[in-house]
């Protein structure tokens, strides 16, 4: 569903693939940590974490992608567009990510229910991982796949829509 929404919003075939891949990478990193630590998770953890972290991270990714597209439409080259998108969206991504972290970490610390504490710990860590991945990896994906994005997106550079 997220793939289709991104595809319709950006009128692109490649952007949903790139954004969902970056988001899923952040989720996999988050879920891999307890595995490698040998920590057991509640049976619903992967479903809950996948859904909530996906929802939070897609906002960060859409924010940066929208700004990147706007800068490309203004005629900026890919490096300048990525740099501006990165600088302008980073404060919002960081404040949103840290707020999400603080809320879930607070619940994890004070929850008396083990399942809630465990899931909120994963969500808190996922907020930080997602924030870092969108800030560091998504701009690199824009740099690598700029030509593909421009060719597989309708009106990405400001042409016909």
Report residues per predicted region.
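Residue-level signature of transmembrane alpha-helical entry/exit and packing/kink sites
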Residues: 15, 19, 47, 80, ...
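Short alpha-helical segment immediately N-terminal to, or the first helix within
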Residues: 6, 67-74, 108-109
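Juxtamembrane/interfacial segments around transmembrane helices
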Residues: 42-53, 68-76, 141-156
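Transmembrane helix-bundle signature of multi-pass membrane transporters/permeases
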Residues: 49-56, 85-89, 123-127
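Hydrophobic transmembrane alpha-helices and their membrane-interface caps
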Residues: 13-65, 152
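Helix-loop junctions and hydrophobic alpha-helical segments within the transmembrane domains
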Residues: 72-95
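Hydrophobic, glycine/alanine-rich multi-pass transmembrane helices and their short helix-loop junctions
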Residues: 3-7, 28-40, 90-157
């Amino acid at each position: 569903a997220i793939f289709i929404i991104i595809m319709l919003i950006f009128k692109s075939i490649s952007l949903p693939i790139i954004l969902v891949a970056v988001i899923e990478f952040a989720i996999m990193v988050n879920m891999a940590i307890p595995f490698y630590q040998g920590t057991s998770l509640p049976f619903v953890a992967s479903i809950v974490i996948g859904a909530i972290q996906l929802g939070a991270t897609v906002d960060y990714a859409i924010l940066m992608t929208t700004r990147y597209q706007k800068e490309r439409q203004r005629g900026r080259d890919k490096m300048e567009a990525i740099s501006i998108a990165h600088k302008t969206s980073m404060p919002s991504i960081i404040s949103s990510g840290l707020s999400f972290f603080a809320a879930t970490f607070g619940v994890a610390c004070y929850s008396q229910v083990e399942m809630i504490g465990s899931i909120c710990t994963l969500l808190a860590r996922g907020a930080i991982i997602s924030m870092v991945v969108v800030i560091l990896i998504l701009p690199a994906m824009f740099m690598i796949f700029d030509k593909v994005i421009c060719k597989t997106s309708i009106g990405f550079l400001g042409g016909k829509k």
